[in-house]
Design a protein with these regions (language model features):
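Conserved acetyl-CoA-binding loop-helix of GNAT-fold acetyltransferases
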Residues: 91, 97-110, 137
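Conserved beta-strand in the GNAT
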Residues: 57, 63-72, 90
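Conserved GNAT acetyl-CoA-binding A-motif
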Residues: 105, 112-124
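Glycine-rich phosphate/pyrophosphate-binding loop shared by adenosine-nucleotide-utilizing enzymes
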Residues: 8, 62-67, 84
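Conserved GNAT-fold acetyl-CoA-binding loop/helix
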Residues: 22-45
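A short beta-loop-alpha structural element at the N-terminal edge
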Residues: 8-21
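A short helix-loop-beta-strand connector motif used in the catalytic cores of GNAT acetyltransferases and
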Residues: 45-57, 85
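Conserved beta-strand-loop-alpha-helix junction that forms the acyl-donor binding cleft
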Residues: 121-131, 149-153
Length: 153
């Protein structure tokens, strides 16, 4: 990571970070701006009450510049060890290629290990080949499974 980021914090995100997190996610999904703020706040309140969900973030002078969500899922297979799903991985366009994504995903993987998970999974859009190369570089295997998605209305 570059030395110019001495003010960077890597930590669990809180309600105080929500507005900045929404701004960051608008880079990933422009429809974030159309979402009902009351629904977002209600969802965030639910997330904060659930110790199996954590938003990991890189925060530079109060601005969330990289984030991901990790969800620990109880499981009855694999000797009843849980698994971890990582979703919503994004780094601010102005902060990319500086190791921040690796750090926030690393935080999520540490949470998974602390929780006794037997694996960590994430999905990525089929056309995001740059992201795929990044995930493989940091230890994920894109050739072992095939993800399926069903969008619900």
């Amino acid at each position: 990571m570059e030395d110019g980021y001495k003010s960077m914090e890597f930590r669990k995100l809180t309600g105080a970070d929500l507005e900045s997190l929404i701004d960051l996610y608008a880079q990933l999904d422009a429809d974030m701006r159309k979402a009902d703020p009351d629904k977002i706040k209600a969802a965030w309140n639910e997330i904060e009450r659930d110790d199996k969900i954590v938003y990991c973030g890189a925060v530079d002078n109060g601005k969330v510049v990289a984030a991901c969500c990790a969800v620990i899922v109880p499981n009855i297979t694999s000797f009843a060890r849980p698994l971890c799903l990582i979703e919503n991985v994004v780094t601010d366009e102005q902060y990319r290629n500086r190791g921040l994504g690796k750090e926030v995903i690393g935080m999520a993987v540490r949470k998974a290990k602390e929780s006794g998970c037997y694996k960590v999974m994430l999905q990525s859009g089929i056309k995001r080949t740059g992201a795929h190369a990044f995930y493989e570089k940091i230890g994920f295997d894109g050739a072992t499974k095939k993800a399926f998605d069903m969008r619900l209305k």
